[in-house]
């Protein structure tokens, strides 16, 4: 029975490279001269520190552009709330989402069932497995999910006959 997996994985090495490029650009840009803005990465989180909300937005914009250039979807980032830090600065923690949460998995399964395609979907840890009798139904399912905006970056892997 043909099947495929829906996963949401981010290449952390690419995130690390994008963060390093953003740090380098912030150090060189004229509008950040004299600013204490910085970006640090800890496992699956990126911490952004800036002088004020305007600088914070500019730093995040630089980071997003570097991530986009490295083919990392902005959908895989979850932004924490902006909080005050010491010295009158502001901080925001951005977490990099790995895997599909149970809630998103249920949402994906609901979309698939709603479409009335002859496939079955089930949640397996942090991925969703879709099985069907023929390959065309699976390909239609992939196209359906690509067309929907589920606020999550999805990759379709492990396509088997």
Curated annotation (Swiss-Prot):
Which sequence ranges form a coiled-coil region, renumbered to this chain?
none
What CDD domains does the record tag this protein with?
YajQ_like
An example of a Gene Ontology cellular component annotation for this protein is: cytosol
Q: Name the source's superkingdom.
A: Bacteria
According to the UniProt entry, its GO molecular function terms are: nucleotide binding
What keywords sit in the KW lines? Nucleotide-binding
This chain's function reads: Nucleotide-binding protein.
What family is this?
A: Belongs to the YajQ family.
Protein name according to UniProt: Nucleotide-binding protein Glov_3198
Please tell me the species this chain comes from. Answer: Trichlorobacter lovleyi (strain ATCC BAA-1151 / DSM 17278 / SZ)
């Amino acid at each position: 029975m043909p099947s495929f997996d829906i996963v949401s994985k981010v290449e952390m090495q690419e995130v690390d490279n994008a963060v390093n490029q953003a740090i380098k650009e912030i150090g060189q840009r004229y509008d950040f001269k004299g600013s204490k803005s910085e970006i640090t990465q800890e496992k699956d989180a990126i911490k952004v520190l800036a002088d004020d909300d305007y600088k914070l937005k500019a730093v995040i914009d630089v980071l997003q552009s570097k991530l986009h250039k490295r083919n990392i979807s902005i959908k895989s980032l979850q932004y924490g709330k902006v909080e005050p830090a010491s010295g009158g600065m502001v901080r925001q923690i951005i977490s990099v989402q790995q895997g599909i949460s149970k809630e998103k998995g249920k949402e994906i399964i609901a979309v698939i069932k709603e479409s009335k395609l002859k496939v079955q979907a089930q949640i397996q840890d942090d991925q969703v497995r879709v099985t069907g009798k023929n390959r065309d139904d699976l390909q239609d399912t992939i196209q359906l999910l690509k067309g929907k905006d589920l606020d999550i970056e999805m990759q379709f892997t492990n396509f088997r006959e």
